[in-house]
A protein has these predicted regions:
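Long, charged low-complexity segments
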Residues: 308-319, 334-414
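Extended, hydrophobic/aromatic-rich amphipathic alpha-helical segments that build helical scaffolds
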Residues: 329-332
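Hydrophobic/aromatic side-chain positions at a characteristic register within alpha-helices
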Residues: 321-322, 326
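Peripheral terminal and linker regions in Fe-S/redox and tRNA-modifying enzymes
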Residues: 1-320
Length: 414
C-alpha cells in the first residue's frame, strides 16, 4: 500500500476531461395564466430560483428513483423543448431540469401534470434514498427498497405534518456497504442479519446525525439493531417526537438535546422479536414472499454484514466454552461458517450435517472432529441433557473454525 501510495504521489495528477455541452438557443414561449391552485403548490415545493435572474430549476420528484420507460420517453420529448434541453439525475434519486424561464413555468407545469410528474411530494418523502438491496445485489442483506416503501406508507398514514420536516433525509442501505450513502443521512439505516433461535431475522442498524456540508460534514452515529418489521413504527414515533419537541424544526438541536436518547428508548421498545410460532412476519423481509435467508451466497460475493453475522456466532461459541456450555459451543462453531458455502441451516441438526459435508468431508476441518459432530447430532436429535464431550476437544474445534475465519479472504475463500 505504501509503495503504491508513494508512486501515485510522484505522478502528475491526470488532467480532468470535461465534456463540452452545446449552447442551446430556443424561443421562450409567452406565459399562459393558470387558475389551477395546484400550480402554486407545485411552484412552492418543486421550483427553485437559479442565481440567474428570471430562470428556475424544476425538480421532478420520483419515489425511489422509479419511472417507467414509456413515461421517461415522453419526458425526454418535453425536455427537448424547455430549459437547457437536458435533464439531470440527482444523488437523491430524483430528476431536475435547469434553465427554465419564468415564462415557461405554467406550460411546463401543465405538461408535467399530464405525465403525472408534477406531484408536490413532501421533501421528507422525496428525500428517502435506498440502494437496490438484496433484490438484485448479491452483496445486499436486506430488501432496502421494500423497507423504504413501508416507511413512506407508515409516515404518510400517520398524523404527521410531513411538510414541516424541511429537508430531513433518510438513507437506507441493504448492508453495511454505503451504496445509499447512509453515513451522511440525517437518519441512516443499513441492513443486517441476526439469529433468533435457529432462524435468521432481517434487522437494521439505526444511525443519526449525518451531514454533508463542506467543512462541517460529519458521519451519522449509532450501532443499535432493530428488526426490519419494526423500523417503520420506530420512524413514525421518532419523527412525531421531533415534530412535537421544543427544538423543532432544528433537527441538530433536537438530536443534541433529546433525540439520541429518545432513539435509544425507542430501540428498546421495538427490538423484541417474537417466536416464529407467534408472529411469522418478523421472519420475512419487506416485500419478500419467502422466509428471510442468506442461502445462495457463495465465494466471490460478500459484504460486511456477513462478516458481522459470523463474528457474532464465533464470539458466542468462545463465550459458551468459558461457561461450560459445550453443546452450544459446538453448534455455534458448526453454524458460523455455513454462509461462506452458500448454506443456511433450518435447525441445529441440519447445521451439524452441513458442517460435516462442507468442512470435514472437504478437508477444511480435520477428520478427527467427526466423532464430536456425530455425538452432537445424536444429542440434538435425542436428548441434549445426555451430551458429554471433552472441553479441550470442543475448545479445539472452536479454535479451528476461528482460524479458518481469520485466514479467509474478502471473497469468503479459505
Amino acid at each position: 500500500y505504501e509503495d503504491e501510495l508513494s508512486k501515485l504521489n510522484r505522478e502528475e495528477p491526470p488532467t480532468v476531461q470535461l465534456r463540452t455541452l452545446p449552447q442551446r438557443e430556443h424561443t421562450i414561449t409567452e406565459s399562459k395564466p393558470t387558475l389551477d391552485e395546484g400550480f402554486f403548490i407545485w411552484h412552492e415545493k418543486n421550483v427553485e430560483p437559479q442565481k440567474q435572474e428570471g430562470y428556475y430549476l424544476v425538480h421532478i420528484p420520483l419515489i425511489l428513483g422509479d419511472i417507467t420507460a414509456d413515461k421517461l420517453e415522453k419526458l425526454a420529448d418535453v425536455v427537448e423543448i424547455y430549459g437547457e434541453g437536458m435533464m439531470r439525475a440527482t444523488q437523491g434519486q430524483n430528476l431536475v431540469i435547469r434553465w427554465i424561464h419564468e415564462n415557461e413555468l405554467t406550460i411546463l407545469y401543465q405538461t408535467l401534470k399530464n405525465l403525472d410528474l408534477a406531484n408536490p411530494l413532501a421533501s421528507i418523502i422525496r428525500n428517502i434514498v435506498a440502494c437496490t438491496g438484496a433484490s438484485t445485489c448479491r452483496l445486499g442483506i436486506c430488501l432496502s427498497r421494500g423497507l423504504a416503501r413501508a416507511i413512506i406508507n407508515e409516515i404518510s398514514d400517520a398524523e404527521l405534518d410531513l411538510d414541516k420536516f424541511n429537508d430531513i433525509n433518510i438513507h437506507i442501505s441493504g448492508c453495511p456497504n454505503s451504496c445509499s450513502r447512509h453515513p451522511i443521512g440525517h437518519i441512516g439505516l443499513f441492513g443486517a442479519a441476526r439469529h433468533i433461535g435457529n432462524r435468521l431475522v432481517p434487522h437494521y442498524v439505526i444511525q443519526l446525525g449525518g451531514k454533508l456540508a463542506g467543512s462541517e460534514t460529519r458521519l451519522a452515529q449509532g450501532k443499535e439493531f432493530i428488526p426490519a418489521r419494526n423500523v417503520p413504527a420506530f420512524m413514525t414515533d421518532f419523527l412525531r417526537a421531533f415534530q412535537e419537541s421544543p427544538q423543532h424544526p432544528d433537527y441538530e438541536a433536537f438530536l443534541e438535546m433529546q433525540g439520541r436518547k429518545l432513539a435509544e428508548q425507542l430501540v428498546t421498545k421495538y427490538k423484541h422479536v417474537p417466536p416464529f410460532e407467534k408472529d411469522k412476519n418478523y421472519y420475512f423481509d419487506w416485500d419478500a414472499e419467502s422466509l428471510f435467508s442468506l442461502a445462495g451466497r457463495g465465494t466471490g460475493e460478500c459484504s460486511a454484514g456477513v462478516f458481522d453475522l459470523i463474528n457474532i456466532d464465533l464470539a458466542s461459541a468462545h463465550e459458551s466454552v468459558k461457561e461450560g456450555k459445550l453443546l452450544s459451543a459446538t453448534i455455534l462453531s458448526a453454524r458460523s461458517l455455513l454462509v461462506t458455502q452458500g448454506q443456511e441451516a433450518r435447525d441445529s441438526a441440519e447445521a451439524l450435517i452441513l458442517f460435516s459435508r462442507y468442512f470435514i468431508d472437504t478437508g477444511l476441518v480435520d477428520e478427527s472432529f467427526r466423532a464430536l459432530i456425530e455425538n452432537t447430532q445424536h444429542s440434538v436429535s435425542k436428548s441434549e441433557e445426555d451430551f458429554i464431550a471433552d472441553i479441550g476437544e470442543v475448545s479445539a474445534l472452536v479454535e479451528v473454525v476461528q482460524n479458518l475465519y481469520d485466514n479467509m479472504d474478502q471473497s469468503l475463500r479459505f
